Design a protein with these regions (language model features):
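Bacterial N-terminal signal peptides
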Residues: 23-25
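C-terminal segment of classical bacterial N-terminal signal peptides
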Residues: 27-31
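N-terminal secretory signal peptides
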Residues: 1-8, 19
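Histidine- and aromatic-enriched segments that form or immediately flank copper-ligand environments
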Residues: 40-163, 218, 254-266
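Acidic-aromatic/histidine active-site loop/patch
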Residues: 172-243, 249-252
């Protein structure tokens, strides 16, 4: 077992995680050298990466790679400045990591395999620990191979210590393009977007709609909002004059979305 890049014994690991419920966020208070010479509350989350049969609300079930058996993975919601501990157990057949997209971190916690850390091997455990800064809406995901496309992603919400504006309701919308086939499809159907369509690049694939230009491939089976497609997407319910905060996360491999709200101007 591994924590902070170092091997630890099973007994030590069990001592540090005893009483933690799988998938739950448990506040605790203890001394941890990784966080400095102080006692501060730590928000602890437990993730298991594993293959899971899923259905996005339409079509047949298929095998995705998930955190805690769900797509997207569990939302992590913390306050700015809180300390986060994520215990990742890898039950997948391949090595995996968690990258905290947009969060400035020391290399050991950044989750880029073969660059900032070794991938967590099948059957092993790794502990990520870092301070929740800055406030904002972020995406966490595997940075190994096509694992994000296979379902290993979720939202990280860091609430500011002081709200800049008031609102009545809040929704987080995670957008994803899906090849709804076991393990992301075969070698012939797996997502292989050109380099200029990858994360952080100016991809040309627009959804949903006709292909535009030479960069339209690959074709996806569905476009999901919070893990649901088409008619299965849950509507946003609001009252007249409500002030609504939308947190938008694009976890797609190669899709740009044009968003509309009926009767409203964006």
């Amino acid at each position: 077992m591994i924590t902070n890049g170092r091997s630890i014994s099973r007994r030590t690991f069990l001592k540090t995680t005893a009483g933690a419920a799988i998938g739950a966020a448990l506040p605790s208070l203890f001394y941890n050298p990784a966080f400095g010479n102080t006692r501060r509350p730590v928000r602890e989350f437990h993730f298991t990466a594993a293959k899971t049969s899923v259905n996005l609300g339409e079509g047949l079930d298929f095998v995705a790679w998930t955190y805690n058996g769900q797509v997207p993975g569990p939302e992590i919601r913390v306050k700015e400045g809180e300390l986060i501990r994520v215990v990742l157990k890898n039950n997948l057949p391949d090595g995996t990591t968690i990258h905290w997209h947009g969060i400035p971190l020391q290399n050991a916690m950044d989750g880029v395999p073969a660059i900032t850390q070794s991938a967590v091997s099948p059957g092993n455990t790794f502990i990520y620990e870092f301070e929740a800064r800055p406030a904002g809406t972020f995406l966490y995901h595997s940075h190994a191979g096509y694992q994000l496309d296979q379902g290993l992603y979720g939202s990280l919400i860091i609430e500011p210590l002081k709200q800049e504006a008031s609102y009545d309701r809040e929704y987080t919308l995670v957008l994803e393009d899906w090849v709804m086939r076991d393990n992301g499809g075969t070698a012939d159907t797996r997502r292989r977007p050109p380099q200029n369509m990858m994360h952080g690049r100016m991809g040309r694939r627009r959804s949903p709609g006709p292909s535009e230009g030479p960069l339209w491939e690959p074709i996806y089976d569905g476009y999901a909002v919070n893990g649901r497609v088409n008619a299965a997407i849950e509507p946003i319910i609001v009252r007249k004059n409500d002030k609504v905060k939308l947190r938008l996360i694009n976890a797609s491999s190669a899709t740009i979305y044009f968003l509309r709200l009926a009767g409203h101007t964006l």
